[in-house]
């Protein structure tokens, strides 16, 4: 197989909007000397992170009163694109394309005690779901059931058990809404504090991915935001070698066969739970059960919906020009 070309592009865009910044902006790189440079050369050259807001607060640079309600905002967009052009034999060309886009926005309410944060964003990446592409979607007689959907339902118990095993041996946190709670600092007990629900998003999303992409539910990642290692390419295949056959060349000026497959996994607009408390390892954590007030295992994010969009354009195409 001959690799003709490989192109890798990665972009990272970070931004910060800090409302309520008190010092005046200076003339040189936007700096004003107030005992130290404000807001600092790091801010001027875009080399600031979340800690800058804490430093600005400690130095009294932020306006904090009942009229200030606009949070500081930190935006981040990561975009990875990988393209490759292959030509295994003369006339057969394969174009591979893989893409992963992760966009996040964090609102930091620095004017409130504890500086609560809320994160939102979106996520999309290319993947392959051929295993369920031709399985059908059922009909009214069988309740529109399908093999992929039946697998999705069955995979929930496997994913839930994996999550339960992950929480097993941990202790409940003592911060956030868990401060002063009777379970704070005690070993995790699903019978007391609530276990992993089969219908929670942290169960449904991995079960959905395993069912529709053909992955083993015992091995599929548990995150709703798969890492770069899970990135799979889409492709376009063309072949124009048939025109070299004499009988075809006799009647056609050109002939090209084509096939294209596109598939992407997307997480729609999501936000973080304001009351989520980190359990201290591997992204484990809890949210407060509205009815009981007890901790319920949960990911940090409130995800409304995920989707897999798949298509062939075309599944098989012929583009020919006659000799006339």
Question: Where does each model-flagged region fall?
Answer:
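Exposed, low-structure sequence patches enriched in small/polar residues
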Residues: 1-324
């Amino acid at each position: 197989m001959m690799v003709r070309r490989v192109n890798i592009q990665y972009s990272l865009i970070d931004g910060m909007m800090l409302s309520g910044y008190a010092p005046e902006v200076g003339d040189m790189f936007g700096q004003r000397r107030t005992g130290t440079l404000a807001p600092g050369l790091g801010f001027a050259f875009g080399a600031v992170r979340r800690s800058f807001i804490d430093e600005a607060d400690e130095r009294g640079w932020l306006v904090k009163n009942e009229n200030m309600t606009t949070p500081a905002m930190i935006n981040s967009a990561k975009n990875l694109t990988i393209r490759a052009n292959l030509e295994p034999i003369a006339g057969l060309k394969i174009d591979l394309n893989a893409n992963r886009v992760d966009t996040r926005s964090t609102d930091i309410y620095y004017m409130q005690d504890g500086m609560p944060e809320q994160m939102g964003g979106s996520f999309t990446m290319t993947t392959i779901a051929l295993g369920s592409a031709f399985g059908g979607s059922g009909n009214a007689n069988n309740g529109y059931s399908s093999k992929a959907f039946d697998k999705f339902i069955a995979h929930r118990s496997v994913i839930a058990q994996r999550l339960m095993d992950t929480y097993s041996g941990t202790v409940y946190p003592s911060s956030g809404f868990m401060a002063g709670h009777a379970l704070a600092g005690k070993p995790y007990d699903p019978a007391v504090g609530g276990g992993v629900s089969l219908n929670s998003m942290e169960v449904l999303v991995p079960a959905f991915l395993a069912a529709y992409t053909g992955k083993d539910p015992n091995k599929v990642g548990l995150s709703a935001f798969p890492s770069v290692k899970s990135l799979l390419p889409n492709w376009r295949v063309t072949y124009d070698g048939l025109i070299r056959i004499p009988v075809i060349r006799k009647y056609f000026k050109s002939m090209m066969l084509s096939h294209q497959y596109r598939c992407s996994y997307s997480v729609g607009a999501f936000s973080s739970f304001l009351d989520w408390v980190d359990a201290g390892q591997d992204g484990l954590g809890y949210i407060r059960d509205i009815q009981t007030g007890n901790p319920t295992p949960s990911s940090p994010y409130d995800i409304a919906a995920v989707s897999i969009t798949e298509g062939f354009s075309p599944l098989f195409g012929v583009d020919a020009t006659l000799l006339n």
